[in-house]
């Protein structure tokens, strides 16, 4: 199969992303924030993607490639790990059974088959097992397929300092275009000694991709001509029979390329009895950021040669699809460019990618179904899904009429870009557009036949709604305002079908104005905010965020940060907001990624002064640091935990006094006065036990601890159970802790520096926190974590994406878990319903 699919269209919030797919390999074009999850929703297999080609150095083009490369690397790692585990099991079996306890092995064999020879077992050699499994066992990562990146000039600047959080060696597989040599050159961004040869064009067994680099005032754009390898001629039995040839050895000779002479002397070759080879059916992806780039493309020498070849022999150089990407519609909607489009031929599909005409957002059916079920259990905790007017409208509302008019007058086929739409090019009998399970807006899905069928399938399931209990309780609580918490992502490692990676949004009010804090910002966090709140509320949230704190360097906690900063930057510019010297956001990150964040802001943020980046240790109450920083300089990816250093005194009174004294320091008092003005709470970091420079956080309001209006929210980040976080999170109103693993996987949790569900609950209970909420679950729990009676007995809340509550609602919020778990179990256990989610 050979196909072209649009993963994301070019809207005001996303750049175009698409993929060319063959049976055994794929080629990705652009990879923005959220592309990984959208690709996952569409069933794209990451491991097949050989290369990524970028149209631009804009952040929306490439921000998602870190997470994509790490996920893809993890899949490679899993392959290697499986080999290693297989080897370990073989060695373990042989060494334990034959070396340590040969009698036990003999007894086991006797039980299985008493008639077998009971002669003593001989020791087995381990070495032949290694030889049999092959060299990959010795170095299982050596031959794994890597993914190569190709971008415009200066593209490598975007990846400076990424080695401190991205374990994939990007430097070895990153090529940027060199205008002076007209070739892609591998960039030595981490000072490697060996350089691969420059690449004029990309070619492999499936495809040839020709780059076209355009420059105007140092704004570079890359366009790509993608030419698949032409299929060979195929032998046609009927044509051979028409010449009077009989089936048998003659057919075999012809298929080998030999000739056959007929009785009348006519010579028959393979060409005479074969179907014509299928045309190459090229795909062109053209990016035109300005009118000047458009003019340069039309007169470009490479493009002119290609079009001439296509006109000279359209059968061989056939063009199937041309994608036209432009930020403004008038760049491509003009007489000059439309004439250029007509040169490609009348059977070409022209896809217009422009924010002024495209739909704003894409929704996955499975994700909407889960939210629908959660909403049925509690509309208070999982409010009604917001239908934003913008999601089904484009700025240019009469685009269909415009497209029809252009098509009619110029005999060309023009269509809008729809995410999830795939154009099947080979085989010819399946040629055409297909789209499955994806909807241009929430309203499209909830009015669809698919949703009506889903409702019918679950109509016999009794769904208990807990809202009456919560509403009755809320009438009797303190009317003073308490913070509102929303979980934007609740899984670990990488985005999955029903959950995104970690992010928590905390809303507080100051003088009746809503202000926001973000704890962690995994890939796709911006997309999650839009899905939860709609476009208009999202704008208000972004303009009122006052603190973003990142717990540690791992991608599932920080890869969405730059996208959030960029969207805030775009809003400030578009709304012409004038900033004073006190108008800025605190961006608090560990030192391991501070240079990367500062470099990203310097490269692509215009309102730079609005973002003040601080090292997490600035707000670390505990003067004792658990990591040997002098060792980290030479080994940035290793853990060096100084276990000899003691945790602080666990006496709550002493800790409270210590925190207060820390905040009163002259150099810190400035910060804390500003915190109260900006978001009405005090903020501190706490070093925890995960990778180097890992932190938990806590925020609290500035009232007496025994006051009914006092509140405190603690967040563990990723961590093993440790006294440091235990002590500083004491007496939290809301204690948020990671629960990556089930209690049966204590060994895995210890090895990977995480906590189990049971460990997290014990910490929260023992340090006298009022309410416990768990998050950061393993991807194996993609829909729901299996319910345990303990959760109900201890009032433990486990978060799903978009869980939202005021602190005073926590006394009953845990009650949603059991009915939701019952719904999922009812669906999973019923074979007729098993595949409806």
Write out the residue ranges for each language-model feature.
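Charged helix-capping and loop-helix junction motifs
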Residues: 301-303, 750-759
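A structural motif corresponding to the C-terminal end of an alpha-helix
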Residues: 762-772
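An anion/phosphate-binding loop that grips the pyrophosphate of nucleotide cofactors and donors
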Residues: 732
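P-loop NTP-binding site
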Residues: 315, 321, 766-767, 777
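A short acidic, helix-capping loop that chelates divalent metal ions and anchors anionic groups
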Residues: 743-748
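Histidine/lysine/aspartate-rich catalytic loop segments that bind and position anionic ligands
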Residues: 737-742
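Binuclear metal-dependent hydrolase catalytic cores
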Residues: 1-314, 320, 326-715, 720-727, ...
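Conserved strand-turn element in the central/C-terminal portion of the radical SAM core barrel
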Residues: 770-783
């Amino acid at each position: 199969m050979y196909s072209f699919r649009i993963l994301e269209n070019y809207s005001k919030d996303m750049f175009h992303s698409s993929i060319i797919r063959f049976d055994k390999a794929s080629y990705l074009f652009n990879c923005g924030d959220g592309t990984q999850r959208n690709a996952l929703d569409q069933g794209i297999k990451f491991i097949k993607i050989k290369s990524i080609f970028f149209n631009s150095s804009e952040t929306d083009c490439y921000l998602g490639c870190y997470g994509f490369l790490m996920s893809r690397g993890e899949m490679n790692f899993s392959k290697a790990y499986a080999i290693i585990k297989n080897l370990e099991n073989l060695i373990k079996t042989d060494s334990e059974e034959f070396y340590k306890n040969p009698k036990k092995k003999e007894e086991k064999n006797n039980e299985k088959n008493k008639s077998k020879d009971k002669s003593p077992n001989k020791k087995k050699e381990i070495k032949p097992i290694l030889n049999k499994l092959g060299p990959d066992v010795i170095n299982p990562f050596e031959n794994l397929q890597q993914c190569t990146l190709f971008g415009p000039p200066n593209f490598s600047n975007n990846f400076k300092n990424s080695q401190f959080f991205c374990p994939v060696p990007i430097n070895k597989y990153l090529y940027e275009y060199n205008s002076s040599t007209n070739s892609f050159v591998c960039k030595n961004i981490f000072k490697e000694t060996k350089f691969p040869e420059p690449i004029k064009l990309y070619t492999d067994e499936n495809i040839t991709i020709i780059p076209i680099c355009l420059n105007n005032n140092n704004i570079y754009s890359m366009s790509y001509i993608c030419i698949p390898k032409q299929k060979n001629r195929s032998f046609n039995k009927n044509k051979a029979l028409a010449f009077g040839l009989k089936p048998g050895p003659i057919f075999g000779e012809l298929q080998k390329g030999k000739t056959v002479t007929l009785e009348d002397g006519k010579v028959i070759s393979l060409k005479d009895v074969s179907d014509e080879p299928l045309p190459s059916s090229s795909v062109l992806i053209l990016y035109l950021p300005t009118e000047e780039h458009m003019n340069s493309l039309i007169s470009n020498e490479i493009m002119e040669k290609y079009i001439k070849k296509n006109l000279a022999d359209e059968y061989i150089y056939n063009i199937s699809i041309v994608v036209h990407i432009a930020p403004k519609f008038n760049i491509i909607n003009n007489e000059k460019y439309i004439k250029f489009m007509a040169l490609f031929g009348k059977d070409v599909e022209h896809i217009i990618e422009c924010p002024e005409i495209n739909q704003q957002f894409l929704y996955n059916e499975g994700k909407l179904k889960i939210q629908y079920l959660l909403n049925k259990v509690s509309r208070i905790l999982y409010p009604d899904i917001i239908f934003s007017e913008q999601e089904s409208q484009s700025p240019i509302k009469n685009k269909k009429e415009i497209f029809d008019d252009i098509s009619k007058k110029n005999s060309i086929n023009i269509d809008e870009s729809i995410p999830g739409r795939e154009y099947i090019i080979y085989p010819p009998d399946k040629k055409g557009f297909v789209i499955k399970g994806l909807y241009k807006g929430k309203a499209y899905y909830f009015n669809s036949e698919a949703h009506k069928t889903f409702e019918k399938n679950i109509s016999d399931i009794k769904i208990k709604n807990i809202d009456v209990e919560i509403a009755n309780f809320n009438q009797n609580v303190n009317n003073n305002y308490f913070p509102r918490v929303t979980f934007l992502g609740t899984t670990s490692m990488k985005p999955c079908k029903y959950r995104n990676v970690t992010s928590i949004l905390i809303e507080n009010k100051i003088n009746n104005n809503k202000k926001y804090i973000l704890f962690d910002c995994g890939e796709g966090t911006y997309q999650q905010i839009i899905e939860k709140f709609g476009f208009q509320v999202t704008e208000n949230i972004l303009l009122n965020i006052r603190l973003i704190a990142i717990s540690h360097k791992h991608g599932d906690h920080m890869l969405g940060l730059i996208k959030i900063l960029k969207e805030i930057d775009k809003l400030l510019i578009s709304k012409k907001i004038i900033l004073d010297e006190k108008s800025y956001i605190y961006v608090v990150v560990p030192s391991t990624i501070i240079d990367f964040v500062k470099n990203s802001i310097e490269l692509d943020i215009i309102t730079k002064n609005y973002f003040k980046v601080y090292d997490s240790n600035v707000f670390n109450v505990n003067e004792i640091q658990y990591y040997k920083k002098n060792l980290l300089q030479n080994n940035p990816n290793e853990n060096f935990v100084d276990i000899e250093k003691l945790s602080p005194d666990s006496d709550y009174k002493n800790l409270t006094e210590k925190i207060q004294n820390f905040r009163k320091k002259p150099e810190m008092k400035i910060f804390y006065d500003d915190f109260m003005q900006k978001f009405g709470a005090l903020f501190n970091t706490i070093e925890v036990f995960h990778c180097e420079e890992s932190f938990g956080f806590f925020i609290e309001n500035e009232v007496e601890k025994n006051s009914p209006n006092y509140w405190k929210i603690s967040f563990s980040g990723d961590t093993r159970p440790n006294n440091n976080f235990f002590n500083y999170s004491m007496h939290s109103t809301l204690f948020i802790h990671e629960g990556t693993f089930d209690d049966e996987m204590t060994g895995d949790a210890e090895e990977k520096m995480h906590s189990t569900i049971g460990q997290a609950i014990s910490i929260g209970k023992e340090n006298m926190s009022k309410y416990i909420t768990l998050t950061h679950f393993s991807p194996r729990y993609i829909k729901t974590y299996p319910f345990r009676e303990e959760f109900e007995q201890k009032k433990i809340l486990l978060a799903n994406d978009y869980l939202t509550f005021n602190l005073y609602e926590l006394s009953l919020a845990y009650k949603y878990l059991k009915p939701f778990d019952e719904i999922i179990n009812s669906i999973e256990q019923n074979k007729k319903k098993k595949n409806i989610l």
